[in-house]
Design a protein with these regions (language model features):
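N-terminal amphipathic, basic-rich helices that act as targeting or association modules
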Residues: 1-88
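Mobile "lid/hinge" segments at catalytic clefts and subdomain interfaces of large enzymes
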Residues: 5, 62, 145-194
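Gly-rich Lys/Arg/Thr-decorated short loops/hinges at beta-loop-alpha junctions or inter-strand turns
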Residues: 11-13, 52, 92-102, 120, ...
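A short glycine/serine-rich beta->alpha loop
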Residues: 18-21, 57-59, 102, 144-156
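Short, glycine-/Ser/Thr-/acidic-enriched flexible segments
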Residues: 37, 58-60, 91-93, 133-135, ...
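Glycine-rich, acidic/polar active-site loops that bind/position phosphate-bearing ligands
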Residues: 63-72, 104-116, 184-186, 190-194
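Anion-binding (especially nucleotide phosphate/pyrophosphate-binding) glycine-rich loop
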Residues: 79-151
Length: 194
C-alpha cells in the first residue's frame, strides 16, 4: 500500500501545482494525492469546497468499533476496502495495575472483545487484543508513514501526524463509508502556517 501511495504522489502533486499555480504545503500534497478518483480538474477553496477523499487506512478503538462494525456488516461486503484495524484499549480501566485491570476488563467486556475479534477475522480486519497496546501508539509504531492519509475513531488519531501522515479522528459512520469502498467527504481544510 505504501508503494502505491508514493507511486501516485509525484503525478498528483504536479497536477495540483499546475491547477493552483502555487507551491503546495505538505498537507495540501497529501490531500491532493488522496482525492477520490485520483485527480481533479480544478483547485479547491480552503474552508469552502467539500471534497471526496480516499484514505489509505482506518483504525478503530473498541468502544466505537462496535457500532461501526455492526453498520459495516449491513453493507453486504465480504471484506473491508482499505486496511483496517480494531484496537482493544478503551474498555480497560486503569485502576489497580496492568495484570489486575486486564483480567477485570477481559471478564467485564468479554462479549464485546469476542464480537470484535470474530467480526475482524471474518472481514479481514486486523485485531489488536486487550493488552496489546494503546491505539494511537500502536498506529504510530506500526502503520503511520509520511505522505499517507488515515482516519480513526479515536481522538488521538492525529498522533500519526508525528511521522508526516495526515491522520484525522472521525466518527464511526465515516469509518464505515471508507471500509465499504465509499469516499470520505471533508470540507477542504483551512491551513495555518506555523
Amino acid at each position: 500500500m505504501i508503494k502505491q501511495v508514493y507511486a501516485r504522489l509525484d503525478k498528483s502533486v504536479s497536477n495540483a501545482r499546475q491547477l493552483t499555480g502555487k507551491p503546495l504545503t505538505a498537507s495540501e500534497k497529501i490531500l491532493y494525492s488522496h482525492l477520490w478518483g485520483g485527480k481533479t480538474d480544478r483547485p479547491y477553496e480552503r474552508g469552502n469546497d467539500y471534497v471526496d477523499f480516499a484514505p489509505d487506512r482506518i483504525a478503530c478503538q473498541d468502544a466505537t468499533a462496535q457500532m461501526a462494525l455492526l453498520q459495516f456488516m449491513q453493507a453486504g461486503k465480504t471484506k473491508v476496502a482499505v486496511p483496517t484495524t480494531v484496537h482493544c484499549d478503551h474498555l480497560i480501566q486503569a485502576k489497580s495495575g496492568a495484570t489486575v485491570d486486564l483480567k477485570s476488563a477481559n471478564s467485564t467486556s468479554a462479549e464485546v472483545f469476542d464480537f470484535l475479534e470474530s467480526v475482524s477475522n471474518k472481514y479481514g480486519i486486523g485485531f489488536w487484543k486487550p493488552g496489546a497496546g494503546i491505539i494511537h501508539q500502536v498506529v504510530l509504531e506500526n502503520y503511520a508513514f509520511p505522505g499517507g492519509m488515515m482516519i480513526g475513531t479515536d481522538s488521538h488519531t492525529v498522533n500519526a501526524g508525528g511521522l508526516g501522515m495526515l491522520a484525522i479522528g472521525v466518527g464511526g459512520a465515516d469509518a464505515v463509508d471508507v471500509m465499504a469502498d465509499m469516499p470520505w467527504e471533508l470540507k477542504f481544510p483551512k491551513l495555518i502556517g506555523v
